[in-house]
């Protein structure tokens, strides 16, 4: 239930990962203690065990990728679980394509819906594929007309002028950030 905390109504609180939930022994239906980290972000700091019901259960986390079905893995020194199917998981491929075109990366005018259509039509699988697109490819897409296709192609052409550090960021290399 929402609670009043430092002058604001809090409906959700950060817990970060399954390891923290296990360490704090948090279960579905528990009453928890919440505080604001840095006076901004609500976070769970503990469990009120005296209010724990007999019917509470530990949360169950997915063990396989919901998109491609690969078994999730976890690096020893990290908290998050992830899909290792880098080259075959559609969600990961599309995510990398969205990142590549994003404003902070190549700054191409395109949204997730555009990338979804391009992916579903088998027109793009890698960032390089964007630069092979022709206007006729784009006009095959639902809702695309001459003007929108030309704007997208012009935006792609303009992206060839971004500074190298943004290209490097756009490639999405692990541990390489802005």
Task: Pin down the residues of each PLM region.
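Structural signature for extended repeat/solenoid scaffolds and their inter-repeat hinge/linker regions
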Residues: 32-178
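Conserved nucleotide-binding/hydrolysis modules and their immediate coupling elements
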Residues: 1-55
